[in-house]
Amino acid sequence: MIIGYKEKEGEIRSSFETRATTKSVEFRVNVKPWATNTEGELISRLYNKERMLNHAAALQLISTKTAIPVPKLIGSGENPDGTAWLETERTHGGIWLDLVGETCRMPPSKQHTEGECEECAQTAQANASRYIQNEILPQLNALRSDTTGLNGVVIPPLWIMDYDPETFWTPKTDLEQKYVFCHGNLHAHSILMHAETLHVMKVVDWDNAGFFPAEFQHWTVTRLGYEEMFTNTERCKEFARLMV
């Protein structure tokens, strides 16, 4: 039971847990019947096992059709209780982009500071930004489809789900194949950087990936930029309109 939250009849809500099964494998399973928004409030959210299985389908597509570095998919599936699981190869030696600046990443003889390091943070952000623009986006934009979503399931970008958590989106077709493949949540905490070189190692968290209008190819390398994705309600409203 969750204090202060009354479950609505028939709603499907989700949360995810990550744990290591071995030193080289990461295992994720959706285990809790609720989700939270960016304010930390309990909310209703469509899609439970679908996001996990969509993540697996996206990893398989990206790993076979592009050179974008993603975790190696080991397996995925459904549990008897209706939840889903995802197993990937664990990546070692990395740091999330938004955590790089917590300390100086340079060798001891070349460190900028003993505490938080804005210079390292800016270097990592610049490296990630160039990599996204020069490597990731061209490859994603080259993947085309005449139908939105992925494998018949439409899970829109996270900021649209946060703006409109009640709508169940259905595939939309355009014979001109104008839909491009989008990550759906590409920001500083879905980019794993090498802790020493500060270059991109892996791009993770493909739960909301799929084929969408080109306008959905939205990304940021800063925390403020990520917050703006959710707070720009006019843009969220326009993007939601494009989904219909």
PLM region descriptions:
Residues 1-9, 83, 243-244:
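Regulatory N- and C-terminal appendages and interdomain linkers associated
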Residues 8-149:
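ATP-binding pocket architecture of kinase catalytic cores
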Residues 19, 192-194:
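Well-ordered beta-strand positions
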Residues 31, 78, 155, 208-211:
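Residues that form or immediately flank small-molecule/cofactor binding pockets and catalytic motifs
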Residues 55, 185, 204-205:
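Acidic active-site catalytic centers that drive phospho-/nucleotidyl reactions
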Residues 154-171, 175:
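Flexible internal linker/loop segments at domain or repeat junctions
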Residues 176, 180-181, 194-244:
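Active-site Asp-x-Gly
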Residues 185, 189-192:
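Catalytic-loop signature of eukaryotic-like protein kinases
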